[in-house]
Amino acid sequence: MEIIIGKTAGFCFGVANAVNKSKEQLKNKKNIFCLGELVHNKQVTEELENEGLIFIDDISEANEDIIIRAHGEKKETYSEAKKLGLNIIDLTCPKVTKIHKIAEEYEKKGYYIVLIGNKEHPETVATISYCGNNSYIIESKEDIDKALQNLYNSQISKLVILSQTTFSLAKFNEIVQLISKDIEDKNIDLEIKNTICDATRLRQEETKELSSKVDVMIIIGGRHSSNTNKLYEIAKTNCNNSILIESSDELDKNEIKKHKKIGIMAGASTPKKSIESVVEMLKKLC
């Protein structure tokens, strides 16, 4: 059995930064709260809980120190934290913070802002709060008509398109192309800001390449992780035997044994030890 591990598998910079800095904080103090999951990975969440991090769903449950997770938070969350007298430990991924600044800049310039992303994802929920009232989230091409109708009704002649950092590059390009075609005769100035981060893009590209060369493609990561699910979608288009797992316990050993070439890719919030555990199990089957 040949096992090929993707070079881009595992923690991205933003996740590694958030996890490492959280652990540093916990060495000195235990009464630290995190609003929502720091990153979308069950193993990481459990590890941080064991070290003393307290995860909450409502900021009113916190006292003293509050961590802002890697996905970022809505503008009003910061205001509320200050009103409550909380010490903010901001671990928002720098790539996400950059998008917030871009959104504020274009909102001040009077642009209508389209944010392409998963509507319920924490990053998208946070980013749209920086976009002002003249904005719309597009998750799929079915949302385009409504977004553009709002644009035309607003009588704004300037449009900028942004993206969630972990969105599918292929879907982003498809949506941008459809929007561009629709507004080409509408006298609207269009600016496209592909804010999908490089780590996401490279991971998606490598997954596409690797999944076309193997008999089985294993994607490791949280099932509610946006970037991990995108990798799984990409893998399935190239390899029928693509599977998404959170840990090595989920592998069907008897099924895996039947194949000669196994590819492995992991999401941006998947810890190294989860990847190593899968590899170790596969090696025992060789």
Language-model region placement:
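The feature marks the mature, well-folded catalytic cores of soluble enzymes
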Residues: M1-C286
